Every structure is written in structure tokens, then in C-alpha cells.
Amino acid sequence: MVFGDLNERPLKKRRFFVDEEDTHPPSSEAAPVTTNLDTSTISSAGPEGSDVRQQQLNGAVPFPNVKESSRESPGLGPEDKQDNLLKEDEENNGTVDYEILNHSPSIHAQQDQRVDQGLTNGFGGQPSGERTVSETQAFQSSGGFDTSTFASIIGEHLSPESLEKIRKASGDDLERAVNIYFDGSWKSSNNSLSQPLVAPHQQTLSNPCTPVNESISQTVNTKISKKPNQAPSSRCLSQSSRYIGAFGVGAWATRSGVGLLKHGEHVNVERARSQPVSKRGRGGKLITNQKGDVLTRFTNKSGQEIGRLPRETAEWVSTLIDQKICRFEGICVFAPDRVRVNDTIYLQLWCYLRKEAFLPRNLWNMGDDNRSTAFFEEQESAEEKQLRLRQVALVKLFDEIGLQPTTVNDMTKKHKKEGLLRAAEIAEQYDKTKREGKSNESSEDEESPELEEDQLDTLYKKAQSFDFNMPEAQPPPSFVLNLRKYQRQALHWMLAKEKDKKSGRELSMHPLWEEYTWPTKDVDDKDLPAVEGQAHFYVNPYSGELSLDFPAQEQHCLGGILADEMGLGKTIEMLSLIHSHRNVSPSRQGPSSSTELVRMPSSSSAILPAPNTTLVVAPTSLLSQWESEAMKASEQGTMKVLMYYGVDKSTNLQELCSAGNPAAPNIIITSYGVVLSESRQLAMFNSNTQGGLFSVDFFRVILDEAHVIKNRRSKTARACYELRATHRWVLTGTPIVNRLEDLFSLVRFLQVEPWNNFSFWKTFITVPFESKDYVRALNVVQTVLEPLVLRRTKTMKTPEGEPLVPLPRRTIDIVEVELSEQEREIYDYIFTRAKRTFNDNIEAGTLLKSFSTIFAQILRLRQTCCHPILTRNKTIVADEEDAAATADAANELKDDMDLQELIDRFSASMENADTAEAQDPSAKFTTHALRQIQTESSGECPICSEEPMIDPAVTACWHSACKKCLEDYIRHQTDKGVPPRCFSCRAPVTSRDIFQVIRHQSPSSTPTETDLYSSTPASSPHPAPRISLRRIHPLSPSAHTSAKIHALINHLNRVPANTKSVVFSQFTSFLDLIGAQLTKAGISYVRLDGTMPQKARAEVLAEFNRTETFHQEEIDEDEGPDTPRVRISSKNSRSSPKSPAVLLISLRAGGVGLNLTAASNVFMMDPWWSFAIEAQAIDRVHRMGQLRDVSVTRFIVKDSIEGRMLRVQERKMNIAGSLGLRVGGDGSEDEKRKERIEELKLLFE
């Protein structure tokens, strides 16, 4: 028989065709169902009793009156029937192409497959092994197809050839023939049906991996790509499918009739899915917007739909069929003689694992196994959902047929099934919530709960149970620094981790995999054919993979997490490891683990080893620090360091780092941004970057400040996963920032099996945690941490009671700042508006939906506490700046003027006059007045008669008086409604034209307690300090100071000489304002923030640290026996007058990693929600190498939201449950919302 091509058949017509089954016709495919059967229906009809029939369903009693020909060799599928099938198809002239597809076939491929299935089975609905040639001929010559009726329905008379084509395609079914006509498939060409019939299950494969024909081989090569170093089998099943078990199911009828289905009759299973609506998301990822159809139908031998499988069973059976994992043969156990809609029909389904299930999947296109589960992700892609469904389907199938593993990991045995199903349930529930549009209200609740401070302590407990008797290791002579005892112990631990060869001692099964034995008897207790060399198969329930090869765990993690608290010298410890463990052999130690993560696609060019090179990846701000530390710690000529950043990226690393190159660098330093950039290029061009980071296999890779990759879904983290190295290390003071998933990303980078599989992680950590089984979850996390992490804190004490690191004392003071009257008015206005919004949302019940609006107003309040100008429109501020500059240019006055410059200007104007008569009298008076101010001989105040004047101030006409007297005088005249005039010359004056006399501290004198605005002369033998005139009410908005800036400068003026300070703020615009005021105050400073390129950052740090602010004698006095040697040249023994005294730095750019021990004063200008972030910044100064006591000042505005933020911090830190295992937001969703509302109420009290 020759049929038309069905490639163009509309989706809505697909219900008449079997879905992409290649080994059996629709008649031999059935989907499984649950064993929760309603046996009361069985007892009411049929000759057998309910007990016997239930035993038949469970496989205990064989079914009577079932043709033995249908299951002579169930273990091999339908191979035993191939002779009859071949004869039938030869007589029918049927042809077929067999194609192995991936689990996401195209529509055309699905339709082709349906035609193939129909050809293979004659469209009769009966198993091919039971149909004889005579039956087939009789079926084809049936007179049931009425051509006149068909023509009257379609309204057209067709040619005999077309009628014959449609009649054969429909199997003499008039209804199906009408559908075939209207969908137009009968007009398509039949080129795809021109090959002789070769069904895969009818071949005896001499080579298990050899395709049965040319088309199969081509399809496999083009549609299934082998994952590099993948554990799944390199062998294939020697037949198309193999029996693994059977189970019973209670289906339901969708039509009524008499004699539709009989006991013992074979049934067909059809998967008729509606195509889900999909679209391409970011990065080309396919996003499914509609829930897929899981309808699974069964038909009788005539092709009539009898009923459907219940949804709870069809959900996973459809997955196994669609993804070509299993096929099912169904037998009717019981059906009423007269079937009515919704009647229960009992079936027994025989399950066979298909050959395609053991083929490697193209995981690169669908995302790797860790990414693909998309736990708590915004949207689940189609590929990610397929993996989740595959996992659940396999677990439920094996549970249904009672198939138990013969070998399983002890750790996974107890909670595997519950964990996997619960993880899938959570993901499905989250997907449902997103579809229903509830994300706005509970988006943050859907995130995994945050860990409280006490929980983090619990997690770190084992890692921090440091053995002070641990052996020590001495670095080689090439390392010139002296290590403290705890650092030498760390070096011994790291060397032990890197040189551990435990994986080579014994061949053990990978912990993610389970071993199963192929059944030797079927459900009727009949022997199944044995296959030589294939007694077992292996399943990875966490990735859904199957294998016939033993999945060995070839290598475990040769690295770890160095999690010493900030400031304990992790960089120095790691440099000592680089010196101590170098690769002496140029040859590598074999290939990477077969179970390692999915690699990016690579070109034909080999990835070359770099056996002598360590790659260091660090934040941009730390690159120069790593370079300088590496050179300082190494004997000259023993360490070659390459900065791989910016223009230096032109280096070809494959050539430079090759084993035979004596100039190969020992250390390559690069940034996370460079890794991400080259990763994008690699993915974009589908090939290795020429000589880039991904073209070599490093000896060691180190991630500094590794909490940068805490988000496993971030592009930076995924790029770092792809770096190749024998040894992998992460350095971070905070392995867990606030969620358990933070640790997973580090574990995945380290390739710690089995924990680097996110499905496994979810099953044994996330799911128990979500289910409030905190003890089990956190115990497991401690088990993960213990062998991987070495963590010491500055608070640890030795057995002798001495501190682990003898650091100088650190004091933290909170200074309350009073806002000025104008600042308080602005703050109160914004606070009132924010509180009104808060109350309105409380009354409307929409508080959590308006989080972004409320937090935006909270941000404005915090900015007001720093400086009111931060809350204003930038365009308006810029216009006001221009207007102020224009006004100053008109009257030749500025907001801030140097007194000596004014005297010089007016003196020059008089000297340039030709004659004494030509000289301007006002200029002469001004010069005289300014000189009096300079020499402090201006006399008594003309208003209060105080002598000398208190805080002298001058008007624009250069007459002097006390500042307070002058301001009161102008205010008094203004209140009387009289235009203010100068008390001396009666010239018009305004409050904006009053200039305060500012006497700056001498740069070489010791500051006193003098206030910023005090004019009291400093008694000093040094030259007179600089004096400036500063407008009390500046015209320029940015020239206005604020209460916090005022307090900061007061504190800086009281800082002892030769002492440096670091000022942190999270607002870079606030740093701009602070910098302007420091310039006016004559305080030198440098600045570092995230907008600066790497070279500029390095220059700033070098300038700030270039001069030690203390004498060599001071170092010698303070240096203890365990203090690392520091080298200070004699030329830097004393401060340079031009050395910057202050470093302005943003909290984000400088909060981690930097070494700022040159300073001993820290000023935190604004609080952060978590004090841990502030503590990280403080530890940049209070760390190993600091020789002075550290003073920390936190500025908090009194009676403001900043004070309430501190209370929220304290409240969170003080909340603790039993056993220290309470999580933030613990409890129901309502309880979580109540907590958030309470915190907001606390902010708006």
C-alpha cells in the first residue's frame, strides 16, 4: 500500500493518528495507569470474581483466554512476529522509513512517524503478530467504504486513484477518510514512503551500536550529539525494546456501544497532543506559555477510540511515550459487554524500555542538568520542563511496576523518591502560580527562605571546629613571607586536598546512579530471553538518564573552599599553595571525570593543557592587589605573573601556557567580566576563542570573593563553571550569604559529586528545608561543608587562650546627627508622603503589591538623611548650578573664595592704575579690609561691640561683624518689612551675600579641637594657614553642606596627624558632595567607585597606600614574632605632605577584598539593611597587617528612618527558634506577609 505524505496535516486532525511510535503500531502501544482501581465495578460484571481479577491486575494470576501468540517473547518485544509482518507488508507493498528522533520532535517528524506506524501495523488496530495475510487482504477488500456517501459529504467527485489513496489511508473508515480529505494530506507526495520496509525491531544487530539501516545512522548523527565525557552508555540495546515489568490500570470509556472491547483483546494507545503555544525568550530559549496536553487514548482493533487513561497516570505515561523512553503493550482485563460513557475498563500494561532511552541526549541545546530544573525561576523553558517530567515519570514508573535497584547510594536510599516528587511538585506549583498572575504579590515569598545569623552559625559549626593540632606545612624558599601557625596549617590542609588520589584506589559507582537488574521472568512468570553481556542497566533519577555501562566515579574534588573570615590572609595562604604545589610533569593525569558538567560546544581544535599555570579570577578592584601581593611574596625571578585584562587580552594563552614554553606564566590574573565576555564569544560563535581562557586546561583555578557567583542562574556563574582545571578553589569569607542555594553554586563550580547536580541538591537539601525539616536539611549541608571548607574567624582562640590573630583593638561608635532646620523640613515632608502611601496600601490590602513604590520612598528618605539635594530632580539642580555660576560671574563673587587670591586681585587692580587719582577707592578699601581679616586686626564688632569678633563674617561690601550679629540684623530688618542695608555703608545686603571667614588648619600642624567654622587662631609656630571666605547660604545647590558632611569634616579635623581615613557610602552622588566639601576644607583625598576602570582603581589604591603613615621604629616596636615581614623603604618612612589623607569609596566597589590597612579610621556615612555588608567594609581596614587601633564611626541621623533600620537589623538578628534552626519568614505564607508588614510598620513609626 502506498499512502500520501501526512506532513501537512493540521494539528487539530492529529487525534486520528498515533504519536511518533516507531517500534509498534498504535495497536501495540498503551499508556500506563494507576493501580488505585475501583474493583467494585469488576465484581458487578463478567464471569470472574473481583478478587481474582484484582490479582490479575497485580500480576499474581495470569489472564485466561489471551492468545499466547501475543506474548511468546515479551522480553524482546515484537521481534518474534517479524515474519508475518514482513509478509503482510510485502503483499501490501507497504514501505516505511524509520527515524530516531530526540524527545522534542518536530511536527513533521511526528506526522511521518504516524504514517510509518500505520504502515507497520496495517492500521487495523490489532497487534501485527496476530494478523495473517488473509485477514489483511480481507480487510482491504472490505466493502464498508461507500464512495457515493463519501462524495456527497465532501461535495466533489474524485478520480479513482485519489479515492483509492484516501480509502487505504483511512483503513476503510469513512469518518477518518473525510478528515483526511479536508486536511489535504492525501494531496502530499509519497516520497518518504518509497523505501522497502525495514522495522528496527525486526533486525538482529551484529553490532549493538550499529544502526539498522542507512536512514537511522544519518538521523542519529544529525539529531543526537554526544555529550563530552558523559556517563550514559556507549552501548545500545541489542533489540528495539526490552521488557521491565507490568501493572494494572483502570481507564474510563469515552463512548458507548456493544462489543467494543473484549476480555483478553489487545488495545492500542494513541497520544494525541495539542501543540503548546511557544515563543523564543532571551538567549533564544524556548518558553512554553501553555500547559501541554497529556491526553492518552486507547483504541480497539478496529481503530475506534474506546476511552482514555486517567489523568494522574496519563501525566507520566505520556512523558515516557513522548520522550521515547518506554513503549507499552495493553491487554483488556475487563470491559462490560455494553460499554457506556465513563464506565471503568481495566487494562494491564506491559512496559518496555526502548533503545532510544539509552542514547545520549543533546544536553547542550536544552541546558545542563543543573540549570534545566529551573527551581524558583521566573519561567520554566520547554526543555527544562521536559527534564522535570522525565524524572518524575521514571520514578513513578519504577514504583508502579515494583522495580527496585540492586545497588544504590546509602545516602539517597531513604528520601530519594519523596524528595524528587516533592521538588517537582514545588516547581509545578510555582509554574502554576506564575501562570495565574500571582507573581506580584508573592514574588519574594517564592524565593527560598533566608537563613538567620544563628542558622549560619549552626552551618559553620562543623567547618569551624578547627583542630589546632593539625599538622603544619612549610612553604618552599621561593616564598619569602613568614606564615603564621594557622596559615601553615591551612597550607597543609590545601596540599592534602590537592594531592588526594583516593579516586584511583577503587572503582565505585557514581553516587547519582542506581543499578537495576533486567527481569528474567515476565508478569505471567514466563522466562524472558537473556541478552549476553547486558544483565544490568543503570538509571540516574536526578538527570533522567539511562545507561548500559557502569557509571564509575572517576575523580572527586581536588580543591575546596577556603572560607577564613575577612582579613585573615586568604590571598597569602593561596600564594603559598601555588609555590608549594607545582606540576612537575608536563603530562596530564588522564581525562576529566566522565560525570563532569556539560561542556560548551567546542571546535575541532584541542583544548591544550597548561600544566604550570594557575588562573586567578577576582573582582576588578582586586586585580592589582593580587599582582602586587604575588610579586611581594615571591623571591625575585621565581614567579611569572600575567595580568590578563584589557589590552593584555591579545595574548594567545594556548601558545603562552603550553608545557614546553619556559616563559609560561605561573599565575594569570583576570576578572569575572573577562571570563563572562569570553564565554559569550564562545557560545555565540560555537567554537573556542582563539587562545582565550576556555582554550586551555589550567593546573589550578582560583575564584576570589567567590560569593560573586552565588546565583547559579547568573551568566557569570555559568561562565565560571566552564573553566577547565585539575584543581579548583574558591575564596570567600561568606560561603553562604543568606540562602542555601548560595553554597550550591560554589559546590557546582568545584564539581563535588553528587552535590553539583541541582536536582540531587533539591531532593536532599532544598525540599526538606521547604518542608520545614530543618534538622535534616542543615545536617546534610554540614555534611557537605565539613570535607570541603576550612574556616577560621578572628574571634577564635588558641588552646592557650590567645587570639588566633593578634589584631589591634577595634571600636565602633554610633554618632547621632541632628538635621538642620531646613533639612528636617524636607525630611518631614517626604516622610509624611511615604507614610500616607504606606497607610493607604495597608487599608486597601495591597501593601505587598506596592513594595517597589514604598521602598522607592524609603530610599528617598535615606538620601535625605545624607543630603537633601540627592532627592531633587537632576535637571533642575543643573539649571540652578548654571544660574549660580552666571550670578557669581556678574558680581565677581563665588560661594567659596580664597582670601589671599582676593587680596592679590584687588592689589593688582590698584597697581595697574596709572595714577593715584585713577585708583578705585572701593578697591583700596576692600584691600585694606581683607588685610585686616587676614591679620585678625579687624577690631570689635560694630553691632555687639565684642572684641575680637566671634566667628567673623563679611558682607559683599566688605564690612565685618560677628556672624550671628549680622544674621540677626538682616533677619530683624526683613521682619520689619524693610529692605536690609549694610550697617556701615547702607548698601543693600541679603543673607546670600554674607561670607564666613574660614581659617583652615596648617597641613603641617597638629589639629586641635577647633570646630570647622571656628575663627579662633591656632597657636602654632608654623606659617599662617589658608583663609577662605565662604558664603553662608551658597547660590549653588551642591555647595550646600549637610549635617552628615558637617559631622564628617569635624571628625576628620580631629583625626591625629599622619593618620589616614576611609569614608564609605553606598551613594556615589553623595561621595561627589563629600569630595567638594573636603576640597573646601583643605583635606586631600582620592576616590574609588565602580565606574572607574581597573587601571584607575589600581592608581588610586597605589596613591593611597604609597606612603606609610608611621615610622619604621613604630613597626619594629609593634611587630610580634608571628607578624609577617613587611618591607618599607627608607624614602617612605615619613609622610609626604601631598599624600591623600582620605579615601572616598563606594560600599559596593570597596566592600570586599581590598587591603586598606594604611588607614585606621573608618566612617560609615549611611547604614545598609544588613550589617554584614558594613562589617565586610570595616574588615578592609581591620585585618591582618593592621598595626594601629581601628576606630569606626557610623553616622546615624537622629529621629529618622536610619535609626529604625538599625532596629530592624537587631530584630532580625535576635529572632531565634529552637535549636537555632528558625528561618526568616518561617511559617505559612500569611505569617511571612505579617512579618514583612511588621518590619515596614517599624520603619514608619
Swiss-Prot record:
It is found in: Cytoplasm; Nucleus. Its EC number is 3.6.4.-. GO terms for cellular component: cytoplasm; nucleus. Residues 1-85, 117-145, 430-454, 999-1024, 1110-1138 are annotated as: Disordered. Coiled coil: none annotated. GO terms for biological process: DNA repair. Residues 1129-1138 have a biased composition (Low complexity). Pfam families: Helicase_C, HIRAN, SNF2-rel_dom, UBA_Rad5. ATP binds at residues 564-571. Residues 551-753 form the Helicase ATP-binding domain. Residues 442-454 have a biased composition (Acidic residues). A zinc finger (RING-type) spans 941-986. Keywords: ATP-binding, Cytoplasm, DNA damage, DNA repair, DNA-binding, Helicase, Hydrolase, Metal-binding, Nucleotide-binding, Nucleus, Zinc, Zinc-finger. This is DNA repair protein rad5. The gene is rad5.
